[in-house]
């Protein structure tokens, strides 16, 4: 009887674990601003990723980056712009946070952009796959322009 109870308990707990796996978070429209960003990161690098006005943007932070008030700061914002832009005016826009694999993908009919962080090195990877020749421009936008 004790073995049957233990077996049923393990089956129940295992079933709850399998059913309890989080699903990927999917957005079908672009964000209005950074308050609608998706978190992503690995190691000591953290990001907030979103798509605004057809540009892919992300804030970058690193553990240990504190200001004079002991607040954790973002290092700045990166803006990724593709030309011609495959996310402009498309009804097939999709931004997905892949929870089990730890990356964010932005896709449309013509392209897929993947952002992920190497957990062993402080490196952010931005991969772009498109059906047509596309140029990518990445800008760093810092709001810390003077010492405090």
Where are these regions (language model features)?
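Beta-sandwich/jelly-roll carbohydrate-recognition scaffolds of carbohydrate-active enzymes
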Residues: 21-148
